[in-house]
């Protein structure tokens, strides 16, 4: 009987630790990694990054130049259930026990435009609200084929990769709803 109580006690501790880890992963921070070359030279393929999710809790406004993780499936609604499901699927314990399946729906990009901004591309330059952006972080001179204008709707941001000639971003999927921002990049390790 004592052994059963000991096992139940240990299982309770393990379950409690798992629940706390899940809550932290859903609401506070998570680790992620860069897959691909779209954020070079700022971030490299396979860089591990620390992502703060506090912007979602405190509704902090994103700033121009912030690097964010987005859910690129902007045509689908996103809820807290998605955050919990992804936390269960993408945590260390699940990865050790079952391996990982890489999903390409999460992208890491830089905020270029916020609600109400007009984003244009002319003469291989990004223009926000009539002003050419100074972008020392981009990999190389970009070749923009379009002279299309984008107006960023309310509760959305316009994001782009730093490697402009090798990036799928708001130029192809449109502005990203704020509820599709998973978190804000803090540092790599």
What are these regions (language model features)?
Residues 1-189:
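Extended hydrophobic leader/signal-anchor segments used for secretion and membrane insertion
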């Amino acid at each position: 009987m004592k052994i059963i109580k000991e096992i139940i006690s240990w299982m309770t501790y393990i379950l409690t630790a798992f629940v706390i880890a899940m809550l932290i992963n859903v609401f506070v921070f998570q680790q992620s990694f860069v897959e691909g070359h779209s954020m070079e030279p700022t971030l490299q393929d396979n860089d591990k990054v620390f992502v703060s999710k506090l912007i979602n809790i405190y509704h902090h406004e994103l700033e121009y130049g912030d690097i964010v993780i987005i859910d690129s499936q902007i045509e689908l609604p996103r809820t807290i259930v998605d955050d919990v499901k992804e936390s269960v699927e993408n945590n260390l314990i699940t990865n050790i026990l079952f391996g990982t399946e890489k999903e390409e729906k999460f992208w890491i990009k830089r905020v270029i435009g916020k609600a109400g901004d007009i984003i244009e591309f002319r003469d291989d330059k990004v223009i926000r609200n009539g002003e050419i952006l100074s972008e020392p972080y981009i990999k190389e001179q970009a070749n923009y084929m379009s002279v299309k204008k984008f107006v960023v709707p309310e509760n959305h941001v316009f994001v782009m990769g730093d490697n402009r000639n090798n990036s799928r971003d708001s130029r192809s999927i449109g502005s990203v709803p704020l509820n599709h921002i998973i978190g804000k990049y803090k540092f790599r390790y």
